[in-house]
């Protein structure tokens, strides 16, 4: 439960926090997405932002904005909002999907949506699925010769490796301590 001091993200663009804890933006033509997470700061010592920096106790909301720039996953945190920092290198893609619960009780199911399908539903997000597609350097030494389509990218399509190793990392993060999400 949030305290009355937590105003959350401004989900409707009116300059006033709407209590939201997650927001996203789909990248144009399938390019990398943007993800913003927000939570209530209850203690300066245990509420770091995405850069690992503590926040002032007077700051009631901690925001972390993730986006891709120049092949790096960047983070703009509350501790230094003016200067985003890289948190991962060699990134080819960053895709995010959001889970909403449909129905209730034992018949409840999840619907996974992209950011552009989420209008008016941000406060109901239960989980976030993040996919990072990373790539090695061209002509790296070692390992077997790479031939043919070698991996399935974040977009779900088979992609040629183009002589480089790729890794696709996908994880689902449950929000608000709601238990398991499938």
Listing of model-derived features with the role each one plays in the protein:
Residues 1-124, 129-131, 137-166, 181-182:
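N-terminal pilin/flagellin-like segments and related low-complexity appendage regions
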Residues 173-182:
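Short, low-complexity, Pro/Ser/Thr/Gly-rich segments in the mature regions of secreted, periplasmic
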């Amino acid at each position: 439960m949030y305290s009355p001091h937590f105003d959350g993200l401004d989900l409707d663009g009116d300059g006033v926090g709407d209590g939201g804890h997650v927001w996203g933006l789909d990248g144009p033509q399938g390019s990398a997405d943007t993800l913003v997470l927000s939570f209530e700061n209850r203690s300066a010592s245990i509420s770091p932002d995405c850069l690992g920096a503590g926040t002032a106790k007077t700051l009631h909301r901690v925001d972390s904005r993730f986006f891709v720039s120049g092949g790096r996953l960047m983070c703009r945190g509350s501790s230094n909002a003016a200067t985003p920092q890289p948190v991962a290198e060699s990134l080819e893609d960053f895709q995010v999907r959001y889970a909403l619960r449909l129905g209730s009780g034992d018949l409840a199911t999840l619907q996974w949506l992209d950011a552009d399908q989420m209008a008016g539903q941000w406060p109901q997000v239960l989980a976030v699925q993040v996919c990072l597609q990373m790539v090695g350097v061209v002509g790296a030494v070692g390992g077997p010769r790479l031939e043919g389509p070698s991996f399935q990218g974040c977009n779900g399509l088979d992609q040629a490796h183009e002589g480089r190793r790729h890794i696709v990392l996908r994880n689902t993060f449950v929000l608000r301590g709601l238990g398991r999400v499938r």
